[in-house]
Amino acid sequence: MSKKGGYKRTGVDVRYGDESVARFINAVMLDGKKDVATKIVYDAFAIIGEKMTEETPLEVYHRAMSNIAPVVEVRSKRVGGATYQIPMEVKPSRRGALAFRWLKQYATKRGGRSMAEKLAAELMDAAGEQGASVKKRDEVHRMADANKAFAHFRF
């Protein structure tokens, strides 16, 4: 048994009551500045609420996350002196973590405006099956599909 107290789960978000939003705020956070990350995410949700009146920002967020999250990915495995890219199913926790990482990465790369505006734009694009983060998911799926022949090497 661990002496360090174990893993502390992230609680639910204060404003939306959603654990996924709380984890996303933690993913956006830089240098431990959680207040700044919270303001960025809430401002992005407010922008989404203004621009997309037919849906709540939380619905747009969840749709975007399901569109970004990869189902399969490739993992390297060395077999007999050769390294193969083996397609494997992604665990749900990693699926969410990859979606958070890609969303933050490609929102940051967008030009100009504030981070909240860039994040809102990337979330709205991802909810509509567009945007760089959805392209990244498609690229990962294409790699897994191209290496389907090596699926029998699974770990």
Curated annotation (Swiss-Prot):
Xref: InterPro entries: Ribosomal_uS7 (IPR000235), Ribosomal_uS7_bac/org-type (IPR005717), Ribosomal_uS7_dom (IPR023798), Ribosomal_uS7_dom_sf (IPR036823)
Name of a matching Pfam family: Ribosomal_S7
Listed GO CC annotations: small ribosomal subunit
Secretion signal span: none
Keywords: Ribonucleoprotein, Ribosomal protein, RNA-binding, rRNA-binding, tRNA-binding
Single GO molecular function: tRNA binding
Presence of keyword Disulfide bond: no
A GO BP annotation: translation
Complexes and interactors: Part of the 30S ribosomal subunit. Contacts proteins S9 and S11.
Purpose: One of the primary rRNA binding proteins, it binds directly to 16S rRNA where it nucleates assembly of the head domain of the 30S subunit. Is located at the subunit interface close to the decoding center, probably blocks exit of the E-site tRNA.
Family of the protein in this entry: Belongs to the universal ribosomal protein uS7 family.
Name of this chain's protein: Small ribosomal subunit protein uS7
Organism: Chlorobium phaeovibrioides (strain DSM 265 / 1930) (Prosthecochloris vibrioformis (strain DSM 265))
Gene name tied to this protein: rpsG
